[in-house]
Amino acid sequence: MKYTEQKIFTQEQVQKLFLSVNWISGNYPERLYKALMHSSTVLTVWDDEKLVGITRVLDDTEMLARVHYVIVHPDYQGKGIAGQMIEYIKEKYKNFLYIEGMPEDKKNVPFYVKHGFSVMENGAAIQICNLDKN
C-alpha cells in the first residue's frame, strides 16, 4: 500500500471509492473532486493503481484541523488502513491546538476514541443539508 498527500487521483477514481461505501457525495463527482482539490490535506491510499482509501482534512493553518472523513473501500476494510491514515493525520497536525473528527455515523465514534479522540461532553455535530436544493 502506498500512502500519499499528492492529489494524483482522478474524478472517476474518487467517485468509485465514495460509491463503494454508499456515500451520496459520489453522486456529485465534479463537486467532490473540486472540494478535494481545494482541501487542506487529502491523504490517499493506493493498491497499485487502485484508490482504496482517502482522508480529508480542513484546517485553519494554526489552531484547528478537522478530519472530515476517513473512507476505505469495503474490500480493504479491517486491514488497519483507516487507523494508519488517522495516525498520519495526528502526526501531521500535532502542533495544532485541536484536531477534531466528524464521524458521519455514531457507530464510527469508537474508532476515533481508539485513536485518542475524546467525545465532546456537551457538543454535537450540526449541519445544514442542501442536497435537495441542487
Label each region the model flagged.
Residues 9, 62, 106-107:
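Short alpha-helical
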Residues 44, 50-59, 66-71:
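Conserved beta-strand in the GNAT
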Residues 72, 78-91:
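Conserved acetyl-CoA-binding loop-helix of GNAT-fold acetyltransferases
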Residues 1-27, 123:
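Short amphipathic alpha-helix that is part of the acyltransferase structural core
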Residues 19-42:
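Active-site rim helix/loop that mediates acceptor-substrate recognition in acyltransferases
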Residues 100, 113, 118-134:
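Conserved catalytic-core motifs of GNAT/GCN5-like acyltransferases
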Residues 91-104:
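Conserved GNAT acetyl-CoA-binding A-motif
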Residues 82, 86, 107-108, 129-130:
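Short glycine/proline-centered loop/turn elements that form peptide/ligand docking sites
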